[in-house]
Amino acid sequence: MFNPSKDEVRQFFLSAWQRHRAGGVLTPLELIAADWMEQHPEYQAELSDTQSASRDYAVEQGRTNPFLHLSMHLSIAEQVSIDQPPGIRQAFELLRSRLGEHDAHHVIMECLGEMLWTAQRSSLPPDGAAYVDCVQRRATAR
């Protein structure tokens, strides 16, 4: 399983953004990342600053971690592409039809964060079925 360190993740985004801005050749994963970075102009100054790789992004300070946020976009895109956990693609499609791709990702992100928080707190593996159920509920809520 691919399990990069925090520093490797941050360097991935910084170098992909730099190559994207310079018109360089990107890997398929970097192309997906660059698309999400383009959709988040609020992060672009930090992505252009190599010092951002060593910053703390404490929620208590009201700072969103751009690397975590973009990583979640990549995770969700991968999950949807392979329908893992099963049912996530259908739930995403329902959300996308109502909200558009970007907003659908943000709704799914809330469920993903909730699932990971619950798993950490309970010292159990992430519950993919509960995650998909959360997304389905939000996709069908009026």
Label the model's feature ranges:
Residues 1, 24-25, 87, 104, ...:
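Short, surface-exposed helix-loop/turn micro-motifs enriched in polar/charged residues
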Residues 1, 18-22, 35, 80, ...:
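Amphipathic alpha-helical interaction elements
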Residues 2-64:
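Core of compact, soluble alpha-helical bundle domains
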Residues 6, 23-27, 69, 85, ...:
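Alpha-helix N-cap/helix-initiation sites
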Residues 13, 33, 37, 71-76, ...:
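Short alpha-helical scaffolding segments that buttress acidic/His motifs in well-ordered protein cores
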Residues 42-97:
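Heme-based O2/NO sensor domains and their adjacent alpha-helical segments
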Residues 117, 121-142:
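Glycine-rich, aromatic-bearing surface loops/beta-hairpins
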